[in-house]
Curated annotation (Swiss-Prot):
Subcellular location: Cytoplasm
Gene3D superfamilies: Dihydrodipicolinate Reductase, domain 2 (3.30.360.10), NAD(P)-binding Rossmann-like Domain (3.40.50.720)
UniProt KW Membrane keyword: no
Annotated InterPro entries: AGPR_type-1, NAD(P)-bd_dom_sf, NAGSA_dehydrogenase, Semialdehyde_DH_NAD-bd
GO CC entries: cytoplasm
Entry keyword set: Amino-acid biosynthesis, Arginine biosynthesis, Cytoplasm, NADP, Oxidoreductase
Role played: Catalyzes the NADPH-dependent reduction of N-acetyl-5-glutamyl phosphate to yield N-acetyl-L-glutamate 5-semialdehyde.
Principal location listed in the UniProt entry: cytoplasm
Family per record: Belongs to the NAGSA dehydrogenase family. Type 1 subfamily.
Protein name: N-acetyl-gamma-glutamyl-phosphate reductase
Residues annotated as the enzyme's active site: C149
Cytoplasm as UniProt keyword: yes
């Protein structure tokens, strides 16, 4: 039986990506789309690429009848999601794409987001949505917290290595480049074409990026002790994609073997042959993450490079992957499309 889906906050980039993916899903149909500031408008007037997808018009959240909805995706901003989800029917399955439920400890949320959580009980119940590592818990979850796109990329590259003790836990560096869609659709001066094109810049320097909270939480959990990484994100003038280059101390061949073993049988994680490096071009529009390992012959370090699409595997695609599990569907349903090249 086809599952009925609501998307809350459908007028943002991740909401539109959910529409694109679910429009081609064999077992899901969208019955409600919300966008309070654009209520009453057809989705195709907001995103013309969705014309012909047969989507309902945008409405306000309070106008949605959730009685027949099997699962809701919440693509609202952080701090808004928690209050909205708290008010939803208690038996409604929810995949949240915001940052509101990623950190298990309310004190960690307050530290990184500058305010107390409005739904701490739900925060503690939420399952972290890094599918390949929380698959069993996600199947039985009522609320799944989508990962940060940067945090997901770094974890796919490093988590199996930390868990298996093949890298120095006290010397991990992540340099990451993200496309501009990662900053959202809101009008911001620094994202104007003339401000961003023909250049790139680092941001959230000095250990201030909020996704560090996810790295701290997840890496420390699998290591069994405190692990803190050095993380520097960069914003680049392309639309989609994340490329993370991770520098670690460890034997590169052993690192490659560990990643190959960890992801054997995983449909959406592809470990490239030793010495090869991935490109964001190859994963654009897909739910795949490509990982390469290279030995640095001068420093003795290993370089692990991971590429994914921040809107798909880094957010909406992974959200659909989690929803498939929560609804008892084939995990890969609606997600097997290849990228567009060139």
């Amino acid at each position: 039986m086809t599952k009925k889906i609501a998307i809350l906050g459908a007028s943002g980039y991740t909401g539109a990506e959910l529409c694109r993916l679910i429009a081609g899903h064999p077992d899901m149909t969208i019955v409600a789309l919300t966008g309070d500031r654009k209520a009453g408008q057809p989705m195709a007037s907001v995103y013309p690429f969705l014309r012909g997808a047969g989507l309902p018009d945008l409405v306000r959240i309070e106008d949605v009848d959730f009685s027949g909805v099997d699962l809701a995706f919440c693509a609202l901003p952080h701090a808004t999601s928690q209050s909205v989800i708290k008010a939803l029917p208690a038996d409604l399955k929810v995949v949240d794409l915001s940052a509101d439920f990623r950190l298990r400890d309310p004190a960690d949320y307050a530290k990184w987001y500058g305010k107390d959580h409005d739904a701490p009980a739900l925060q503690k119940q939420a399952i972290y949505g890094l599918t390949e590592f929380y698959r069993d818990q996600i199947r039985d979850a009522r609320l799944v917290a989508g990962t940060g796109c940067n945090a997901a990329t770094g974890q796919f590259a490093l988590r199996p290595l930390i868990e298996n003790g093949v890298v120095d836990l006290d010397d991990i560096i992540i340099d990451l480049i993200c496309g501009v869609s990662g900053a959202g659709r809101a009008l911001k001066e620094n994202l104007l074409h003339a401000e961003l094109s023909e250049g790139t810049h680092a941001y959230a320097l000095g250990g201030t990026h909020r996704h560090l909270g996810e790295f701290d939480q997840e890496f420390s959990k699998v290591a069994g002790r405190k692990v803190e990484v050095q993380f520097t994100p960069h914003l680049a003038p392309f639309n989609r994609g994340i490329l993370a280059t991770c520098y670690v101390k460890g034997d590169a061949q052993a690192i490659h073997a560990t990643l190959t073993a960890a992801y054997r049988g995983e449909m959406f994680i592809e470990v490239l042959p030793f010495g090869a490096a991935p490109s964001t071009h190859d994963v654009r529009g897909t739910n795949y993450c490509h990982i390469g390992v290279v030995a640095d012959r001068r420093s003795g370090r290993a370089q692990i490079v991971a590429a994914l699409d921040n809107l798909c595997k880094g957010s909406s695609g992974q959200a659909v992957q989690n929803a498939n599990l929560m609804l008892g569907l084939e995990e890969t349903a609606g997600l097997l499309g290849l990228g567009v090249f060139p």
